Amino acid sequence: MSPLANRRFLKMHGAGNAIVVLDLRGTAVRVTPAEARAIAADVHSRFDQLMVVHDPVTPGTDAFMRIYNTDGSESGACGNGTRCVGYALLDDPAMARPAENGALTLETKAGLVAVKRITERSFTVDMGQPRLRWDEIPLTEPFLDTRRIELQVGPIDDPILHSPAAVSMGNPHAIFFVERDPDSYDLGRIGPLLEAHPIFPERANISIAEVTSRDTIKLRVWERGAGLTLACGTAACATVVAASRLRMIGRAARVALPGGELSIEWRADDHVLMTGPVYLEGEGTFSPDLFAGIDG
């Protein structure tokens, strides 16, 4: 039987991004890719990201998070999921531990992130510094200027999309800036083609963004390993960084996604702050049948 059988989970969302939070602190249990795919496929625990909370690794941190996509792959960052974990560790009766000033320091394989409560249902996450060098994003070609890279969709003389910005927020992003509604593009078709493009050795999140004013952006996202999503916090952060580098906006903006709005600020110290909502939908336990045929 899988060690995940009968374990409790929280079903949450942040700006429409479906999140499942699983607490494995105090155990040596690790989620396998096959188990993550099984959880994602079940109607009761379907997610965009699975946030698994482990005991802290680095002294001074509150927990270590592993982040799984629906295809079982791991991600280094998930802003919406991090806000949900912040809520769980501060408010959930079964998970909460004492925390100073409603603030936590969490660790992922991409580094440290700080999360702080702003209101009862709103949290700010310090997503750290964006990575802008081609080899840090990473890309397979040595672009000296990642504000625009050579990539396009459609005919050479009349491309549908072209010259995206490239940014890493702990995971790679390509952002196409357009002058009409992002909903008018078939991102469900374009996204998977570009996600796996050879220029992205670790695959990439693909976004289409329209800057609608000096402090507002409309965004659609094809998420690496998950597909079309109602919201993606790291994509919102990457988009604000990219738009600011191109002088389309200042250093802060409200980003409108299909699932809701996120407020992003790229501070002078190079850290990116993301503020947004958290909603608890309910809780459940994993049925042993969910993992039938899977070795734990």
Swiss-Prot record:
The keyword Acyltransferase does not apply. It is found in: Cytoplasm. It is an enzyme of class 5 (isomerase). GO terms for cellular component: cytosol. The keyword Ligase does not apply. It catalyses: (2S,6S)-2,6-diaminopimelate = meso-2,6-diaminopimelate. Belongs to the diaminopimelate epimerase family. Homodimer. This is Diaminopimelate epimerase.
